[in-house]
Structures are given as C-alpha cells and as structure tokens.
C-alpha cells in the first residue's frame, strides 16, 4: 500500500538546485514565454531543486501520518492481543509514550505562503516530537534548528528523517505483533504437550 512516506524526497542534488535557478533566471531576464513548453511544465510542476509549498505540505502530511500511526498502534496491539487471548504485559507495549505524540501538522500551504517564525518553529517542533519517540539509527539526521538559509541537504535530511522514523516504527510494530504471535504459538505448543498429544 502506497503512503505519503513513499513520496518523500531525500535525493535532491546541487544539479536539481541549479536547474531551478537556470529556469528562474531565464524567466527573470526573458519572461515566462522564453521557456519552452517542456520547461514551463517542468517549472510549474514543482521542481525537486526548489523547496516550496508542495514540499511543506508533503512533510506536514508525513508528520500527521506518522503521528497517527504512533498514537493508534497501542490500541491496535491491544485489540490483537485480545483477539488472540494474550494478556497485557509490558513486553507487548510500544517503547514510547503515545500521549507525548502531539503535533500540529500544517498541510494546507498554498503558493505564495511564506513560513512565519512561529510556523517554522511548529514545523521543526513536529519533527522533534516524532524523532524523540524511537531509537533511530546512529546516522539519522538531527532536526534542523532553523529553516533560514535552507539548503538542499537540509531539505533532504528533513524528509529522510521522516522516512527513518516511519521505517523504525514499522520495525517496532512488526516485532510487537511477532511477540504476540510467538506467545500464541508457545501456548498452543504447551497445551499440545500437556494434553498428551
């Protein structure tokens, strides 16, 4: 199943940035009509080397998606345990406090919007909230302290961090479901042994 996580962009390059500036300079010096139909379509589609409202919305959507997964997973696991007849135990609990997963993901940026300092702070705070929930790989990017002077590397790091958080959450989820399944299998084996079969 495809999700917003599959749309994250973390492979921007300097060449992508250069392409944006090439087309932008062409527009500024010769006008929009100086672009070929292909260049115009490329420019209007939201270029990978630019960071604009579509990128901000994608990050907001990914934040909301991950936060929703984090907050709903405990009840999903509880329902699964109940269905399988497995009692609650700390070994089946998520390694974070779901109540602390509080984000304010903005997903309605439009062309021309400029992030205010408070919106930029909230944008980065969302990343901080999600990042601190799980133990991530040692090379996981840090949350940037500001969006001022944003580079393509920082933009890549923001979206790669979200990818890693989601991947780690998926691994945690799979392990917790597996623990429940192994418990059920162990009970079935024990019952089989003690029933004389």
Show the residue positions of the predicted features.
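Extracellular "spike/adhesin" assembly and maturation modules
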Residues: 1-197
């Amino acid at each position: 199943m495809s999700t917003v996580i599959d749309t994250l962009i973390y492979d921007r390059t300097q060449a992508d940035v250069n392409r944006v500036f090439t087309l932008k300079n062409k527009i500024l010096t010769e006008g929009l009509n100086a672009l070929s139909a292909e260049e115009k379509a490329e420019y209007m589609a939201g270029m990978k080397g630019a960071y604009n409202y579509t990128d901000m919305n994608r990050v907001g959507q990914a934040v909301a998606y991950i936060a929703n997964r984090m907050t709903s997973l405990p009840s999903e696991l509880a329902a699964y345990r109940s269905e399988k007849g497995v009692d609650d135990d700390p070994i089946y609990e998520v390694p974070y406090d779901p109540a602390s997963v509080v984000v304010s993901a903005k997903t309605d940026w439009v062309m021309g919007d400029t992030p205010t300092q408070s919106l930029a702070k909230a944008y980065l705070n969302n990343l901080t909230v999600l990042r601190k929930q799980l133990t991530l790989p040692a090379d996981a990017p840090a949350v940037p302290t500001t969006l001022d002077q944003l580079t393509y590397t920082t933009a890549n790091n923001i979206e790669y961090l979200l990818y890693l958080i989601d991947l780690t959450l998926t691994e945690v989820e799979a392990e917790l479901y597996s623990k429940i399944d192994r418990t059920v299998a162990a009970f079935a084996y024990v019952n089989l042994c003690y029933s004389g079969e």
